[in-house]
Every structure is written in C-alpha cells, then in structure tokens.
C-alpha cells in the first residue's frame, strides 16, 4: 500500500486527474437531481418510423391545406325538424279504387286494391274470396249475375236458364266435382233449345247449325283456328273445351244461347281475360280445322 501511495505521489498528472474526476462526479450529480424533478417516462425501443419523428407530429393546423370556411346557418330547427334530412319520402298514397286495368306487353293486367285497414287474417280472407270467384267464373256467367247484400256478406245469384245435369246453388260451389265424361253428351229437353237462328248463321260459313246444345256437344272438342294479323305469325289454334275450361263448362255456356261460332269464341276469350291480347295479334274470324 505504501508503494502504491508512493507511485501516486510521483504521478505528474495526479492533481489534474483528480480535479477532472471530481468535475465529472459533480456533473453526474446535477443530472441525477434534474432527472428526479422531471416526470419519469418509460423508454421503449424505437422500432417504428412514427417513433423516430415524434417531434414533427403536432396537433396544430396543417399549413398544407387551406382553412375550411365556416358555414353560417341562421335557421334554427326545431326538434321535430332537425332530422328531416334523414327521412325517406314515400309516394303519396293513391285513393282506393276497386279495379285498375293495364295493358302490358299485349297482356291485360287487372289490379285489385285491397280494402283499407285490413288485418293480416282479413287480407287472406279477401284473397281467398277473389280466388274463389275466379274459379267459379268458368261455371257461371258472372257478368249476368245479380249481387245482393246479406248479413254475412254478398250473395251472387245466377241470372240464366241452367241446363240439365248442372247445379248452380251457391253453397255447393266449393265442393264442385268435375262431371263424368258421359255428362258431356247429355241432351237437354227440347224446351231448353233455341229455335231462333242467329244473325250470322253457321250454314253461311259452311258449318252445321250450332243453335242447339246437342250440336255444340259435337263441336266443343274440334280444333278452331284464327289467322294472325301479321302473316309471319302462326295461326292460333284451340278448342272450345280449352277456351271454357272443360267440356261441361263449354256446353253449359253455349247451350240454348243461339250464338254463332265467332260470338262463342269472343265470349270464351273474354272469360279467360285474353280477348284484348288476342284481338291485337289475331283476326277474330274463327273456322274449324
């Protein structure tokens, strides 16, 4: 130890070195005191570019963009009017109409407007009623029927002379059973036949007389052809049975009516709701094939 002390004494820069060490200790002590006064923050590794440029990120206005002018709104909206901009404008409700006819692409469209303020159950009942009327329209002439009010609804009364083998009671409509093939050839009594010839007789068209039901029964399954308005189209072919829905329906409608072939075809087309469509594309001059 004595030798170490001797060496240190003989060191020529001992005083300068000691002074430098003391200065470093004093500077280090000042840094420690200053860091204790500041808030201690955890230092994380600078992995991302945003951490390396924190000094350039400020919350002040961006000088690269022009200032946005403030819009003055002198109109003060009420609470009810504040959200008008977000409301959906619906089309104005149309007044109630029972039936609207439209012709779209040559096809007749009938729009039935449902009664107002119906519940879901009542709406379904209304749809079923309309469907039932469409179904029974093949059996009776609704355009000649009478409508009467009853305590439960409406009563539709057929206004025509029924043929033999056909029941037109209203209560039996939902349980209608298609007739057997033998009923298609039922010959009605002579009291139901019409002896008055039509204005356009079938004989003038080269056809047998069709004034009686017995004659119609032999023609309802014969092919009928009507020519197109445009020659490039094919003729339209059908039978009276197809037109009226069944042999029995055609026989019931035509028996005792005194119709000629053209009138019978026009009536069938109207019942099926395709008369306007057909008369635009075809000439209503029917003839048996």
From Swiss-Prot:
GO terms for molecular function: RNA-directed RNA polymerase activity. It is found in: Virion; Host cytoplasm. Residues 182-204 have a biased composition (Low complexity). GO terms for cellular component: host cell cytoplasm; virion component. The modification Phosphotyrosine is found at residue 11. The modification Phosphoserine is found at residue 246. The record marks 270 as: Interaction with the Nucleoprotein-RNA. InterPro entries: Phosphoprotein_C_viral (IPR043036), Phosphoprotein_central (IPR037263). The record marks 126 as: Involved in oligomerization. Residues 170-211 are annotated as: Disordered. Keywords: Chaperone, Host cytoplasm, Phosphoprotein, Viral RNA replication, Virion. Nonenzymatic cofactor regulating the function and conformation of the RNA polymerase and part of the transcription and replication complex. Binds the viral ribonucleocapsid and positions the L polymerase on the template. Acts as a chaperone for newly synthesized free N protein, so-called N(0). Plays a role in virion assembly. The N-terminus is disordered and is involved in binding N(0). The region of interaction with the L polymerase is necessary for transcription. The hinge region is highly variable. The central domain is involved in oligomerization. The C-terminus is basic and essential for binding the N-RNA template. Homodimer. Interacts with the L polymerase; the association of P and L forms the polymerase complex and positions P optimally for encapsidation of newly synthesized genomes with the nucleoprotein. Interacts (via N-terminus) with N(0). Interacts (via C-terminus) with N in ribonucleocapsid (via C-terminus); this interaction allows to package the L polymerase in the virion and positions the polymerase on the template, since P acts as a bridge between N and L. Belongs to the vesiculovirus protein P family. This is Phosphoprotein.
